[in-house]
Amino acid sequence: MSYKCAVCGKGSRSGNTVSHSNKASKRLFRPNLQSLNILLNGIKTREYVCTSCIKSNKAKKAI
């Protein structure tokens, strides 16, 4: 599974974890993806969609 939203294309971003001593180490920020049956180009498919697309109704749920 690639960490990418099927609707908006949001994916992983890199950043730093900063400790109390201010030492930075690399980490990944990943989107909150949920598996969902959606209508994508008029076809019902099971895709991974980020929660911001679900909340804003960019992903139309297929029933």
Swiss-Prot record:
GO CC terms, sorted: ribonucleoprotein complex; ribosome
Molecular functions (GO terms): structural constituent of ribosome
Source superkingdom: Bacteria
GO biological process: translation
Entries under InterPro entries matching the protein: Bacterial_rp_bL28, Ribosomal_bL28, Ribosomal_bL28/bL31-like_sf, Ribosomal_bL28_bact-type, Ribosomal_bL28_sf
Keyword hit for Ribosomal protein: yes
Cleaved signal peptide residues: none
Keywords: Ribonucleoprotein, Ribosomal protein
Family, as annotated: Belongs to the bacterial ribosomal protein bL28 family.
NCBIfam families: L28
HAMAP family: Ribosomal_bL28 (MF_00373)
Name this protein carries in UniProt: Large ribosomal subunit protein bL28
Organism: Endomicrobium trichonymphae
